[in-house]
A protein has these predicted regions:
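Electrostatic cytochrome c docking/interface patches
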Residues: 17-36, 50, 54, 130
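A contiguous binding-surface segment within folded domains or other stable secondary-structure elements
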Residues: 29, 37, 42-85
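Axial heme c-ligation environment in periplasmic c-type cytochrome domains
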Residues: 52-59, 80-135
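The canonical Cys-X-X-Cys-His
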Residues: 32, 36-46, 94, 107, ...
């Protein structure tokens, strides 16, 4: 009987962590703003415009909207090598910041909906988890 009670409690503990309710898009964007301030603003700036030729813009970025999964992978794994954003070539390194999948989803939702950017897409931690490093071609 004790073994059954122990296994039951263990199962409840394990499954309760798996059943975490999903944030709303607004909650995700709000959380993403904090992450952007902590990890992204130093290079991409608070206005999302980046620095021409050095740090690509997030505001009105054709690369971001045309390559959402690749953008997720860049945050998740880091990014190096040439990319073209709004017809300008960038050839730098963006280090992996060690963010959790939920944090990556939140910051992507923030970026996709700031500075005039608008996206119907709602990035989830599950989508982030499914993005492989191989998509970067590095």
């Amino acid at each position: 009987m004790r073994l059954f009670a122990f296994l039951y409690c263990l199962a409840v503990a394990v499954f309760s962590t798996q059943l975490k309710p999903q944030k709303s898009k607004a909650e995700s964007i709000a959380a993403g703003e904090e992450i952007h301030q902590d990890f992204c603003v130093q290079c991409h700036l608070s206005n999302g415009e980046g620095v021409s030729g050095v740090f690509p813009p997030l505001k009105a970025s054709d690369y971001l909207f045309e390559n959402i999964n690749r953008s997720i992978a860049g945050i998740k794994y880091g990014l190096k090598g040439e990319i073209t954003v709004n017809d300008e070539i960038y050839d730098g390194v963006m280090a992996n910041q060690g963010l959790e999948e939920e944090e990556i989803a939140d910051v992507m939702n923030y970026i996709l909906n700031q500075w005039g950017n608008q996206s119907e897409e709602f990035i989830t931690p599950q989508q982030v988890a499914a993005v492989p490093k191989s998509i970067l071609g590095q």
